[in-house]
């Protein structure tokens, strides 16, 4: 990558060192705690499926039953597989049904029974991880067969009506019109559900519920489109909220390609407890690493509440922290869709030059990451002509700065849920800019010591200063004080805290052992 900003390599190294210092205590916290969703994800990998007549998933019934008898601190794998042996059952879903009926008691076995339970749990979870491995190999095979999109950035488009059977033809039409990645945005508030709904769904609110069956249906439909178009069309969903680990496991089992995955989004904008979501994030990222899924992080959201000029450095800080957390969980650089956005008020003088400085800074700090570039939303007024022009400038900045994933902006943002015709016009805009200026990046070199370079240096310096302060006080304190997105979220508050447990001395999680490389 050509260095265009002349960043100080010592300062860049210092920024990464400070991010690691700020992030390390959070990783230790995540390594010493578990959550109901982590344990449910383990059981999903072990093969538990389905829901009771009220729609409550059997994994929820089983984890709740174990927690009521022995707590969560030992992990659920050993108590569950011990009970399976005592009840002389082979099907974990059947055990969940008996547990829900109150006819099974759980205990923490010792000695030979504990060894046997660990062996059984590991065998079952390893089979689930092998399924994830097969789906990853399948993706790699299909990418070789159909090919990747010929251009970068990939064109990423949101489709979601609430009805998966309506989403499918819309997604296929979007792929034909040029979309490379389809995101099925979730029904409003799903991130606050502490369970994953079951089955195909036909109604949602400003989005479509994320379920394993919906994942399967859409992936199959986009495979058809990939065959038809001669390029592999990627599918995106959301591993955020209270069920991050389960969403990651289901995405791996159903061969999704990208997942939104950032605990900061849940903390700031869904008031989810910080400890809960950092524990969940680490496990979900380990699953994503194994599944070959590209994560997308949510820094763009800060700029919807905070000012995009004044708080630009908080985006850089968050990107550096996300890189540290992702690497620690096993994700490679090519899997880091670090987020940022074109959200500066267009009335600010030189706003386009500022956007170029910020976008180029992200590109140069993370040269091997496929950055996720998000369109203007906050300053879309309902004037669709102005909106289309703004989106054109956004697309141009994406091309000039080598972004990896470009979310298509809608000129009707803040007016209506997009019509098919709105998407078509938006895609025409992207196709024109990438077709006319896709190679302009090689000619675009900011003036040495000029406005763009100076702004990028200033943002990096501010990011380092903020990381120094965060390191002195702790990341959880900084989040509690409203450092990011001007939202104050203390570590002892928020949704989902009651689903967190500290590890006991004999805690056992076969999925983590396998994902961290102690065999498969």
Predicted regions mapped to residue ranges:
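Alpha-helix-loop-beta-strand connector modules within alpha/beta enzyme cores
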Residues: 137, 141-148, 196-234, 278-295, ...
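Hydrophobic alpha-helical bundle architecture
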Residues: 358-422, 440-448
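Flexible, glycine/charged-enriched surface loops at secondary-structure junctions
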Residues: 225-232, 330-335, 368-372, 439-454
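Hydrophobic faces of well-ordered beta-strands that scaffold small-molecule active sites
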Residues: 153-161, 181-185, 231-239, 258-263, ...
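Long, compositionally biased, glycine/small-hydrophobic-enriched stretches that function as flexible linkers
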Residues: 1-167, 173-178, 186-214, 241-247, ...
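Glycine-rich phosphate-binding active-site loops on the catalytic face of alpha/beta enzymes
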Residues: 180-191, 254-271, 322-323, 394-417
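Short amphipathic alpha-helices and their capping/turn segments at secondary-structure boundaries
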Residues: 167-180, 248-249, 280-287, 395-396
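Conserved, well-structured core segments that form the ligand-binding/active-site neighborhood
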Residues: 204-332
């Amino acid at each position: 990558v050509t260095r265009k900003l002349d960043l100080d390599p010592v300062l860049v190294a210092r920024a990464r060192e400070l991010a690691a210092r700020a992030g390390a205590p959070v990783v230790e916290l995540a390594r010493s705690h578990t959550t109901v969703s982590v344990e449910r994800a383990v059981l999903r990998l072990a093969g538990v499926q389905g829901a009771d007549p009220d729609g409550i998933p059997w994994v929820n019934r089983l984890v709740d039953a174990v927690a009521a008898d022995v707590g969560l601190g030992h992990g659920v794998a050993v108590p569950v597989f011990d009970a399976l042996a005592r009840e002389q059952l082979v099907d974990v879903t059947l055990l969940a049904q008996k547990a829900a009926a109150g006819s099974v008691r759980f205990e923490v076995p010792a000695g030979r029974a504990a060894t046997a339970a660990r062996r059984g749990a590991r065998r079952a979870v390893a089979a689930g991880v092998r399924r994830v491995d097969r789906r990853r190999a399948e993706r790699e095979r299909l990418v070789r067969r159909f090919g990747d999109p010929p251009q970068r950035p990939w064109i990423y488009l949101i489709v979601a009506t609430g009805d998966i059977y309506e989403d499918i033809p819309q997604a296929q039409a979007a792929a034909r019109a040029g979309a490379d990645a389809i995101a099925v945005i979730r029904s409003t508030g799903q991130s606050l559900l502490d369970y994953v709904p079951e089955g195909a769904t036909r109604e949602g609110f400003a989005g479509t519920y994320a379920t394993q069956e919906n994942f399967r249906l859409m992936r199959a439909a986009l495979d058809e489109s990939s065959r038809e178009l001669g390029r592999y069309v990627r599918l995106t969903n959301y591993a955020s909220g209270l069920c991050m680990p389960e969403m990651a496991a289901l995405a791996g089992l159903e061969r999704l390609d990208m997942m939104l995955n950032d605990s900061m989004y849940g903390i700031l904008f869904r008031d989810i407890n910080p400890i809960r979501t950092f524990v969940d994030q680490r496990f979900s990222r380990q699953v994503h690493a194994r599944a070959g899924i590209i994560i997308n992080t949510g820094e763009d959201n800060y700029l919807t509440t905070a000012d995009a000029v004044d708080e630009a450095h908080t985006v850089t800080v968050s990107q550096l922290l996300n890189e540290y957390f992702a690497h620690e969980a096993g994700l490679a650089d090519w899997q880091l869709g670090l987020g940022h956005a074109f959200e500066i008020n267009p009335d600010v003088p030189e706003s386009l030059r500022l956007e170029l400085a910020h976008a180029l800074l992200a590109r140069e700090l993370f040269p091997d990451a496929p950055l996720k570039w998000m369109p203007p939303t906050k300053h879309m007024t309902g004037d669709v002509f102005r909106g289309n022009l703004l989106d054109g400038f956004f697309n141009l900045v994406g091309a000039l700065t080598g972004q990896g994933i470009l979310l298509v902006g809608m000129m009707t943002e803040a007016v209506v849920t997009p019509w098919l015709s709105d998407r078509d016009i938006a895609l025409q805009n992207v196709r024109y800019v990438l077709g006319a200026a896709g190679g302009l990046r090689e000619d675009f070199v900011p003036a040495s010591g000029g406005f763009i370079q100076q702004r990028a240096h200033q943002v990096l310096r501010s990011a380092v200063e903020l990381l120094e302060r965060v390191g002195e006080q702790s990341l959880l304190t900084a989040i509690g004080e409203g450092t990011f997105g001007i939202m104050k979220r203390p570590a002892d508050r928020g949704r989902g805290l009651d689903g967190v447990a500290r590890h006991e001395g004999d805690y056992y999680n076969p999925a983590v052992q396998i994902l961290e490389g102690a065999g498969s």
